[in-house]
């Protein structure tokens, strides 16, 4: 009886290992790999996940990451698959400029396509949040530097 139960348990557990990943799982893995690689500065790995048509634009838009822009966190916030070969991801970035301490957030929409089983990002655009993540020209207002000392008065009696 124990042998039969053990054999049945092994057969059922081995059957679960044979299931290939679904299209949504493959798309999620590709999007996660691109965004985490970009966050940690591995732009060569991240750029390989962009389609050949979008690669040059991707590299240009992320050129300031690691030098003037520090990406603090990235999160896949949502996913929509209109069909098995296309996916749309909502990605939330927390970031800051390296010369200031203000935390900013931006939501980005990424469009992905399956090319023969391999997923590639076709486009990305800012959907909401702070401007400047992709190197857009932003006028940064800085406070006027004031003299931190009090005015000095000299009192003399001659």
Name these PLM-found stretches.
Residues 1-6:
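Bacterial N-terminal signal peptides that target proteins for export
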Residues 88-92, 111, 120:
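Soluble periplasmic/extracytoplasmic beta-strand elements of cell-envelope proteins
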């Amino acid at each position: 009886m124990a042998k039969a139960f053990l054999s049945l348990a092994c057969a059922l557990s081995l059957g679960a290992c044979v299931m290939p990943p679904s299209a949504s799982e493959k798309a999620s893995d590709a999007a996660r790999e691109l965004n985490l690689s970009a966050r940690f500065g591995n732009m060569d790995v991240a750029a390989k996940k962009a389609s050949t048509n979008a690669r040059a634009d991707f590299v240009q838009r992320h050129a300031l990451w690691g030098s003037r822009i520090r990406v603090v966190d990235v999160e896949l916030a949502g996913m929509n698959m209109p069909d098995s070969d296309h996916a749309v991801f909502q990605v939330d970035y927390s970031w800051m400029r390296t010369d200031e301490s203000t935390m900013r957030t931006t939501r980005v929409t990424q469009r992905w396509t399956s090319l023969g089983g391999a997923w590639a990002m076709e486009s990305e655009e800012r959907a909401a949040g702070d401007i400047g993540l992709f190197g857009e020209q932003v006028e940064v207002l800085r406070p006027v530097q004031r003299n931190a000392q009090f005015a000095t008065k000299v009192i003399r009696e001659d």
